[in-house]
Amino acid sequence: MALCLKQVFSKDKTFRPRKRFEPGTQRFELYKKAQASLKSGLDLRSVVRLPPGENIDDWIAVHVVDFFNRINLIYGTMAERCSETSCPVMAGGPRYEYRWQDERQYRRPAKLSAPRYMALLMDWIESLINDEDVFPTRVGVPFPKNFQQVCTKILTRLFRVFVHVYIHHFDSILSMGAEAHVNTCYKHFYYFIREFSLVDQRELEPLREMTERICH
């Protein structure tokens, strides 16, 4: 089972990324730069900092897409253990419950099972990052004025995936030998959102004790 999570971070993934960067684009070059820094062994706090001369929205866009792919893959490796029966409510322990709301099917906050919430979340994020009006890929096309607000909402909801996985499926992480991989992804994500103040501090509370232990 340990091989399963290693495949998540390798070139031969069991679960394919939903979004790729087009070779030859500025976004692709930034992605390569970010990945090279990750593999260089640099401190993750340093890795997330905006490189000199780069556009902050491009940098955020690259990381939002990368985190979406990675977190989607992490959840995918343990999705069979997160069922309507085992997780009838999308929650983070007894104190935190997450309800789903969107502009189509659920206009009011709805209590859903964790797998249903996850499916809606991943589809919602995928639709946003594939929307040229939100995540433009053409040269010279500016980001929308509310781009960072959109990214804040995406990253806040992705953080909730970490909350659910760590609190409700930590045994699965351990049984797959995946703790180090998931922790590294979480630390990378955490340092990034803190560097650019992209997620409200209150949203981070469910994993505060763990974060203090592994990120400080």
Swiss-Prot record:
Which species does the entry assign this protein to?
Bos taurus
- What does the entry list under GO cellular component? cytoplasm; nucleus
Entry keyword annotation includes Metal-binding: yes
Identify the domain of life.
Eukaryota
Supply one GO BP term: signal transduction
- Which residues are noted in the entry as Zn(2+)-binding? C82, C87, H164, H169
Pfam families registered for this protein in UniProt: Mob1_phocein
Q: Which InterPro entries match?
A: MOB_kinase_act_fam (IPR005301), MOB_kinase_act_sf (IPR036703)
| Name of the protein in question | MOB kinase activator 3C
Source gene? MOB3C
Offer an example of a GO molecular function term for this protein.
protein kinase activator activity
Going by the UniProt record, its keywords in alphabetical order are: Metal-binding, Zinc
What cystine pairs are annotated?
none
Name the job this protein performs. Answer: May regulate the activity of kinases.
Q: Which family does it belong to?
A: Belongs to the MOB1/phocein family.
Keyword Metal-binding found: yes
Gene3D superfamilies on file: MOB kinase activator
